[in-house]
Amino acid sequence: MTDIIPENVNNSKITIICSAPDLASQNIKNHLLNLTEWKNLELPPESRFSAARESIDGKFRLVDIEEIHVFQDGLDRKLEAAGLPASLIIFASKHRSKEEINSLTVHCTGNPSGEARLGGHPKELAVSSPAAMKSILSGMKKLAGEKELKYDVTLEVTHHGPTELSVPSIYAEIGSTEKQWEDPDAGEVAAKSILAVSLEKVPVAVGFGGGHYAMRQTGLLLETKISFGHNFPKYQLEFVDEALVRQAVEKSGAEFAYFDRKSMKSEDRKKISEILEKLGLRVLKESEIRENYGLDD
């Protein structure tokens, strides 16, 4: 790679953020560097970024940070100030779980409750990119299957930070232990899926119910034409109010809602249904989504 000062720094790009202390992030980064050609970008002296590169095709930037991802509130402004404006931010990251499940995941960020222990602000949601989440998760599913990887490919619910971002952002992750974070096959699958990302418009839903791994929403995302923006699991529905639902709709472009009904308490269904009715958003059942938005044969 040669050092090149970008000729048009005002041109927004899909920007992949890789964190130095994150093993999965470094794994994905190494594959990104090998899968396509990049040119180094000169950073201003005041920039806190470690390095920045742009793909030769001009579609992506790859930016290195020394901190962890979740506390990167205001990152879009920092990128802009460094002459690296982003149209979409993809955080290449590790996923950790107590169950230590082999996993490839995507999700958007936000703090539905009044707490923000892992970055972001309480009761604030980030702008999501349902199209990017659908594209990357579908790519992960396809490529992991071709490699016969024993990984769960799943959509996670909205959680942690950063939330203070004015451009869309998503996480693309490898989980859930050091063994998987450094797995070269998983790193390759994640990197290829990111580089193949499509931002083609898709029908968007906001999801309610289910667990942290939104299994029913994952099935609908992978098996129909729709995608999801924000998803709220059953254990956080008590925090859902009109302001939060309004945020979820406005920051994802949601056109309708989906309930994982059996997982939801009746009082939560009633409360959220009334909010959605007030906002003019209909609730579609799984059967209706599959009928109206089924994949073409």
Curated annotation (Swiss-Prot):
InterPro entries: Deacylase_DtdA_archaea (IPR018033), DtdA (IPR007508)
Entry keyword Translocase: no
The enzyme's E.C. designation: 3.1.1.96
Quaternary structure note: Monomer.
Species for this entry: Methanosarcina mazei (strain ATCC BAA-159 / DSM 3647 / Goe1 / Go1 / JCM 11833 / OCM 88)
Annotated signal peptide: none
UniProt function note: D-aminoacyl-tRNA deacylase with broad substrate specificity. By recycling D-aminoacyl-tRNA to D-amino acids and free tRNA molecules, this enzyme counteracts the toxicity associated with the formation of D-aminoacyl-tRNA entities in vivo.
Top-level taxon of the source organism: Archaea
The protein's name: D-aminoacyl-tRNA deacylase
A Pfam entry, by short name: tRNA_deacylase
Family statement drawn from the similarity comment of this UniProt entry: Belongs to the DtdA deacylase family.
Record keyword Magnesium present: no
Cofactor section: Zn(2+)
Gene Ontology terms describing biological process: D-amino acid catabolic process
PANTHER family named among the record's database cross-references: D-AMINOACYL-TRNA DEACYLASE (PTHR34667:SF1)
Keywords noted in UniProt: Hydrolase, Metal-binding, Zinc
A molecular function (GO) term: zinc ion binding
Cofactor binding comment, as recorded: Binds 2 Zn(2+) ions per subunit.
Catalysed reactions, as listed in the record: a D-aminoacyl-tRNA + H2O = a tRNA + a D-alpha-amino acid + H(+); glycyl-tRNA(Ala) + H2O = tRNA(Ala) + glycine + H(+)
